[in-house]
Amino acid sequence: MTMRASFTRTLGCSLPILVLLTPLVLGSPAQAQRGRPSAPGTAAPVPMQPSWQSPRELERVNHDLAKAQRDLAEASFFAQRGSSPEAARLLELSRQSFAEAQKALQGGNVFAAREQAKAAENLAKAAKALYKAELGFGGPPGRSFFEAPLRAQESLSRLQAEMTFANITSGPVAELQQQAQQLLGRVNADPASYTFADYSRSKAAFHSARAALHLLAAERLSGLGSLSSF
């Protein structure tokens, strides 16, 4: 068999296969139309999912919610044994922030949900610190023990600056700012007479200010005026 005859025979055998493969390679007319602008009256292409719905962001917000829920459970445990009205109010605000976080997540705003969850976590920690001081729970003093008033003052100063910039004078943020300021005003900063109660009030002031900052961030991300609805 000559080379030309062999080539002709091979080509003849391959033609049916090429005919079958051509639509798969080139695509159907309907597939080709997908890359073109939609004509009037036709269905628009399905949009891509927003970046905030990425699995990584959802994982982060669920992690923040889990942390807030854990601190809420611990603060609620101490609330059954303590009677501090300040701690009770902080715990109430924590529950409200946690509910707002869940609401924001259901609405698709995971960034606002994360900020609300962090606010709930800090509020629960503030309540827990006050309950522990009331019930006499303490621990060995460390570096953070004596630095607590300074850290609280730094967070409070930042909060006051943010409030001035945003012109906030009422609502939960203003309430938390006043709470943090009052708690710090009751702290004895003299190292010779500094006690665990002073440390607990400093921690509560720090977490109250941090919670207010997270509420401010949630407000900016949501734009729904939620800070006046608590």
What do these predicted regions represent?
Residues 31-230:
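Long, charged/polar, soluble alpha-helical segments
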